[in-house]
């Protein structure tokens, strides 16, 4: 990759980070903050502290900047300018849009659409290979020094924030916060992976040649033949592996059943498939 293209890719990443952070901030201000939904993360902490008179944007800056510095000191220099940009820009947009009118005062709608907005924003930030800092950095620090998995660290931090929201506000607000956390996490997955999930099929059949040719000719998908041995008989039992689009999966099942009704088929969701016939990286 030449210098010009590399520069364009870096600029694209920063555009993603800034757009994603802006979407996250606006979603926070129009859905979550006015309805007191502390849906995890630094935004959740700032929602709780806002009820005591602290400005949400200031709280986010006060937490994000020291955490970024701690991350650089304790975890090394991998937290570069992209994380700093997200950590600073998100609270800035929260501050600039603090007087925007709430989109709804219905807590359930706020939790759902706030979670969607936050998820879209954070997902776009991740597409730019960036971060908005906050509790994600705290979780990585705890992960390094406690031995707990990163997922558990994030769950513990978000869980503590939700429980605190239940104490400060009420149990119902805490439940809405849990819903917001769930919706945002699922939306992040959709933004990163997309809706077009594929299916991976592992086919064990005595008619592997016929099945392979049918898949190649009738569905126009590639097939990989994997050598395997039956655990009960110790006989060679080749496995055919193929990945098809969700709309092609029904046709695949019909083809296999027509050729070999006794075929053993294992199916799994392939959340992201790159390469010939599928989307590019």
UniProtKB/Swiss-Prot annotation:
Membrane topology: Multi-pass membrane protein
Record has Cell membrane as a keyword: yes
Transmembrane domains' residue ranges: 14-34, 56-76, 77-97, 108-128, 149-169
Pfam families cross-referenced by the UniProt entry: DUF2179, YitT_membrane
Disruption phenotype: Cells lacking this gene show no apparent growth, sporulation, or germination defect. Also shows no defect in the synthesis of the membrane-bound CccB cytochrome or any other cytochrome with covalently bound heme.
Record keywords: Cell membrane, Membrane, Transmembrane, Transmembrane helix
Major subcellular site: membrane
UniProt keyword Cell membrane, yes or no: yes
GO cellular component: plasma membrane
The family this protein is said to belong to: Belongs to the UPF0750 family.
Domain of life of the native organism: Bacteria
Official protein name in the record: UPF0750 membrane protein YvjA
Organism taxonomic ancestry: Bacteria, Bacillati, Bacillota, Bacilli, Bacillales
